[in-house]
């Protein structure tokens, strides 16, 4: 089993990263293999709506986005982790998700398998429940993933504080990793 982990937080070692590492631990303990991408470090250009992908096997952008999309197509599932900034996912996360369009345009490619989502925000848990539910269904379910669950850690401020103040969230992430 191969899982692609997309870390959309620009903060390595931050709360999303800590939770993702716990989820990865659960997957690896079950014999799974995980390829983790820090989207902040990848060269991913935005979709320019040129429709090149409707006529060709991949996006016109010659960047790391195509490599990641190919990994997603070949994988058995995905973990997507993002902090909530001003009520939405980070720009780093949105860049790769917008590029899902090129897969949807190609009849030889599809996204499938299991998906697990991680959200952190510096607001009380539940503040962004509507947004989280919307994100679970669009684009992940829309593109063909079975969303098996999510971890939402509210009141997650300084980097790594979730490990100290919300150890149950680490357990949730680990347990969700075992479900892959």
Describe each model-derived feature in a short phrase.
Residues 6-8, 39, 118-122, 153:
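Cofactor-binding loop segments of dinucleotide-utilizing enzymes, especially the Rossmann-like FAD-
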Residues 42-69:
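Cysteine-cluster motifs in flexible loop/terminal segments that predominantly coordinate metals
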Residues 1, 24, 29, 139-180:
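Glycine-rich phosphate/pyrophosphate-binding loop and the adjoining helix
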Residues 34-35, 115, 147-148:
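Hydrophobic anchor at the start of a short beta-strand
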Residues 32-42, 151:
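A short beta-strand-loop structural module common to alpha/beta enzyme folds
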Residues 51-55, 98, 166-168:
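Short, hinge-like loop/turn segments at secondary-structure boundaries
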Residues 60-143:
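Helix-loop-strand module that forms the ligand-binding subsite of alpha/beta enzymes
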Residues 1-32:
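N-terminal beta1-alpha1 ligand-phosphate binding loop
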């Amino acid at each position: 089993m191969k899982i692609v982990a997309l870390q959309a937080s620009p903060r390595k070692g931050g709360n999303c990263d800590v939770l993702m590492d716990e989820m990865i631990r659960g997957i690896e303990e079950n014999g799974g293999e995980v390829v983790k991408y820090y989207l902040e470090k990848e060269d991913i250009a935005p979709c320019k709506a040129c429709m090149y992908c409707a006529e060709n096997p991949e996006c016109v952008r010659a960047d790391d986005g195509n490599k990641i999309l190919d990994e997603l197509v070949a994988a058995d599932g995905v973990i997507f982790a993002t902090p909530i900034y001003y009520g939405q996912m980070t720009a780093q996360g949105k860049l790769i998700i917008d590029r899902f369009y090129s897969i949807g345009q190609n009849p030889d490619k599809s996204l499938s398998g299991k998906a697990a989502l991680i959200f952190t925000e510096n607001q009380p848990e539940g503040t962004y429940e509507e947004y989280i539910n919307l994100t679970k269904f669009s684009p992940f379910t829309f593109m063909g993933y079975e969303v098996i669950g999510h971890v939402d850690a509210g009141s997650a401020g300084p980097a790594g504080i979730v490990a100290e103040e919300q150890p149950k969230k680490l357990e949730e992430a680990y347990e969700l990793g075992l479900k892959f």
